[in-house]
Structures are given as structure tokens and as C-alpha cells.
Amino acid sequence: MEAHLDQEMILVLDFGGQYNQLITRRIRDLGVYSELHSHKITAAEVKDIAPAGIIFSGGPRSVYAEDAYRCDPEIFDLGIPIFGICYGMQLMSQHFGGTVERAGHREYGKATLTLNDPSPMYANLPLEQTVWMSHSDLVTSVPNGFVVDGTNVSCPIASIKNEELKMYGVQYHPEVNHTMFGKELLKNFLFEVCQCTGDWSMENFIEIEIAKIKEEVGDKKVLCALSGGVDSSVVAALIHAAIGDQLTCMFVDHGLLRKGEAESVMKTFADHFHMNVIKIDAQDRFLNKLKGISDPEQKRKIIGNEFVYVFDEEASKLTDMDFLAQGTLYTDIIESGTDTAQTIKSHHNVGGLPEDMQFKLIEPINTLFKDEVRELGKELGLSDEIVWRQPFPGPGLGIRVLGEITDEKLEIVRESDFILRDEIKKAGLEREIWQYFTVLPPLRSVGVMGDERTYDYAVGIRAVTSIDGMTSDWARIPWDVLEKISVRIVNEVQNVNRVLYDVTSKPPSTIEWE
């Protein structure tokens, strides 16, 4: 992932911690651009990026172990301010000659931090504050030149500083909400230590991205994959703002869309925005490929590959089509696995592309989280209907029908999902609930309808609250609204006699079921 040129940024090095993406988000929320990069990045690469500051993330390993994640030691010699969090503080301490050992017991949860001669990192903060600890190791002796400026009963070296080198470390996690003044600590690192200006905004992002798209594309043409979701819609609007009629949008109706989706896409982009939109009817082609396939990863790969093959075939009929634009998000890349994390699930936008694909990929929003994409859509002048459209995965209903896909199952999900969205909107909850949809598990149950025994499908409802999709909680939909949804589904959708409600957060679950 490329850093944005001519723009101050904070570089976050990924050492595998569960809160790493939160660090990046917190920094952006403070008006400074930030990106998460592998700990394997070289000092030369860091120098080229020229960040205003560097943050070492937390991580699950021990710095003294053979399999410890390390960074290029020359990064410490670049003269760039460094802030180490948890594992990051331990790594920095070890590098400069400090000692890191196994703690007597793991410390996890809230703790009280007491400050002594605090650094600029703690400017205007109380000398005693609540922080969030999550560690099994601790620094037992600080390196020469470093001073302890924060202690805790269970962790005597909870915060360290070397003001001459502008290097700071904390054993706790300022990026989580449980740390009372965590946001203020990060703010002080950005503005007191790194001297950032805090001028990053979505308006600024648009200006930079339009310039980048113009430079990258030149006088060539771009083919944009429209899916009907907010991500591809925003990508189309952004690229159209940059290159106008050099953009052609292709909308593939793969038979896995929500009710009314195809008509809505054509009306919005072809009629309202006057974009060049080509509609491809490929329902039979996709569904034939998916016959007999139950494994979710296989389904994702098949749908992703078939998308590209269709585009490849259709684009060959067009002239000078060099680029394929996709609505890949930052969360897509993160969830598809990094050096330090296992793949949770492959995303259609970052996996399954054939090696002989004729296009060069252009992914202008792949550094943004979902809520930032919505903000971008507003800045680009998209309607609320588009901006607040429910998130919809590229594989569509193909991963909301669990197991093998059939026409009957697709119709059940399509109709039940329409009812859910309709009732949520009627209840005025569409802005309060981050994402909501129905799924069809491979499950039948006994029921009674009209004095007759039934043996029909159970429909699952998934509704979550979230900010960026990295974590989420199940939505507390009022009981009366759930009752209306349930009654309508079992009465209006054929072959359904039961409705289930998913009350699991992320983690441990993902938002989508497949």
C-alpha cells in the first residue's frame, strides 16, 4: 500500500496486535493521515515515506523468543519520533539494552497509572489515570538514556521516555476506549512530539486521490465494477470526478443481488449521473458454476474469478480499456491476512484474480474504513440513499445462502432481506444499525401452519452496530420491531417457518456468516 505523497503521516508498524487497526483509526480521527505497514518494512522505505512519527504496535509474541517479530534496527537511527505500545515498548527497550522478562502473571484489564515527571506525551493530563493493560511480559530494566515516567502496582515500568531521542513507550494500550486519556496521549504524540498540523480531511483525501488517478491513468480508460454497494458506488463517483468519460462502468447481474438492486443501480448511475454503464446479464453463468458447491471459500473464489473473467471477456469488446477499478477497503486487506495475522476469510477484492488478467488494478479507497467511505461519498455529492446503503459483499447473496446455492434458497434470502430492510426503515433505525441482513442456514425445522405440519427453512437475522467493521456488537432491535419482521417473514416468504436472531459480537464471530 502506498503512502500519500506530500502529506504528513504517522506510520504504524504491525507486530500482530489485536488493536493495531484501532491505532490507525484513532490517528485519522485526530486529523492526521496514518497507515499500517508490516514490521518488515526497511529503514530505507521508511525514509522514503518520511513519516512525521512512527508507532510500534502491540503483539502476541515475546521479544526474547526466537520467533519474535523485529524491525529493521536502522529505523531507530532515522531521527523520527517513535512511540512503542506494549510489545512495541518492549522491543524498543530491548534494542537499546534494556531487559524484558516474563511477568509473574498476565495482566489483563483496567489498571491505575501513576505519573512521575511526565514527558510532553502527558501534557495537561492528570498524574493518576485509568489505563488498559494486556500483556504477559514486562520491561524489568530500562536502557541508558531512558527514564521511567509512569508506574503501576503490577507493572513498575509502565511508561518510559527518552526526550533527547524523542522515543516514548507505554506498557498499556492508549488506543482502546478503556484507557481513560488514551486519545489525549495519542494527540500529544501527534501534535506535541511530532509537530503535526492535523490538516488531513476527506476533502484533502479527494484532492490527493483525484490527482493520483489522473497521473496514473493519463489518457487511458478505466473499467469500474459496479456491484450496487456503497463501496463501488463511491469508487465510480471518485474516478468519474477525476477522468470523466474515460470511465466506463460495468454492472454484472450475477443473480446474487438483493431485491430491486439491478434496477436501482442502472437508475442511479446511468440515468442520474449520466455515466456510461454497461449491464451484463450473467445469472445462468454464475449459478451453473456454483452448482454443487457448499464450501464458502470455494464460493468466494468462484464468484471472484467469474467476475474477472466476465469483465475480461466484455472488456475485450471495448477499446483501450487498461484499468479495472475495485472498491477494496482497508478492512478487506487487513482481514485477508498480513505477515502477522492468519487469513480470516479471503475477500473477493483481494483474492482469486487470475494471473493472466489483462487489467491493471486501481483501488482508490483501499486505505479507507467503511465509515470513511460514507464520508467520502457525502463529499462527492452522492445521495443519502447511496451513501447509507447497506454494506453488500461482492459475492452477494452467494455467501448469505449457507452451503449449496439454489434458486429457491436465493429467493428466500432475497425476500426475507427485503422485509428486514423495510421494517428497519419504517422503525427509523436504518442509521442506528450499522449493518443488517438475513441469511439462510442449511437448516429445516418442524412447524405448524394452518393446522398442518411443516418442515421448512429457518431464516437468520444478523444486525450489528459498529464504526468501521473491525469490531461490532449485535444490535438491540426493539422486540416489537423484531416481532413484525418475524411475522412478515413467515407469512410472506414461502418455505420458511422459523426466524432466528444472531446475538454474537465480532470477535469471536465475523459479521457475515460465510
UniProtKB/Swiss-Prot annotation:
<dbReference type="InterPro" id="IPR004739">
    <property type="entry name" value="GMP_synth_GATase"/>
</dbReference>
<dbReference type="GO" id="GO:0005829">
    <property type="term" value="C:cytosol"/>
</dbReference>
<feature type="domain" description="Glutamine amidotransferase type-1">
    <location>
        <begin position="9"/>
        <end position="199"/>
    </location>
</feature>
<feature type="active site" description="Nucleophile">
    <location>
        <position position="86"/>
    </location>
</feature>
<dbReference type="InterPro" id="IPR001674">
    <property type="entry name" value="GMP_synth_C"/>
</dbReference>
<comment type="subunit">
    <text>Homodimer.</text>
</comment>
<comment type="pathway">
    <text>Purine metabolism; GMP biosynthesis; GMP from XMP (L-Gln route): step 1/1.</text>
</comment>
<dbReference type="Pfam" id="PF00117">
    <property type="entry name" value="GATase"/>
</dbReference>
<feature type="active site">
    <location>
        <position position="173"/>
    </location>
</feature>
<comment type="function">
    <text>Catalyzes the synthesis of GMP from XMP.</text>
</comment>
<keyword id="KW-0315">Glutamine amidotransferase</keyword>
<keyword id="KW-0332">GMP biosynthesis</keyword>
<keyword id="KW-0658">Purine biosynthesis</keyword>
<dbReference type="GO" id="GO:0003921">
    <property type="term" value="F:GMP synthase activity"/>
</dbReference>
<dbReference type="InterPro" id="IPR029062">
    <property type="entry name" value="Class_I_gatase-like"/>
</dbReference>
<keyword id="KW-0067">ATP-binding</keyword>
<dbReference type="InterPro" id="IPR022310">
    <property type="entry name" value="NAD/GMP_synthase"/>
</dbReference>
<feature type="active site">
    <location>
        <position position="175"/>
    </location>
</feature>
<keyword id="KW-0436">Ligase</keyword>
<dbReference type="Pfam" id="PF02540">
    <property type="entry name" value="NAD_synthase"/>
</dbReference>
<keyword id="KW-0547">Nucleotide-binding</keyword>
<protein>
    <recommendedName>
        <fullName>GMP synthase [glutamine-hydrolyzing]</fullName>
        <ecNumber>6.3.5.2</ecNumber>
    </recommendedName>
</protein>
<dbReference type="Pfam" id="PF00958">
    <property type="entry name" value="GMP_synt_C"/>
</dbReference>
<dbReference type="InterPro" id="IPR025777">
    <property type="entry name" value="GMPS_ATP_PPase_dom"/>
</dbReference>
<dbReference type="GO" id="GO:0005524">
    <property type="term" value="F:ATP binding"/>
</dbReference>
<feature type="domain" description="GMPS ATP-PPase">
    <location>
        <begin position="200"/>
        <end position="389"/>
    </location>
</feature>
<dbReference type="InterPro" id="IPR017926">
    <property type="entry name" value="GATASE"/>
</dbReference>
<dbReference type="InterPro" id="IPR014729">
    <property type="entry name" value="Rossmann-like_a/b/a_fold"/>
</dbReference>
<dbReference type="InterPro" id="IPR022955">
    <property type="entry name" value="GMP_synthase"/>
</dbReference>
<feature type="binding site">
    <location>
        <begin position="227"/>
        <end position="233"/>
    </location>
    <ligand>
        <name>ATP</name>
    </ligand>
</feature>
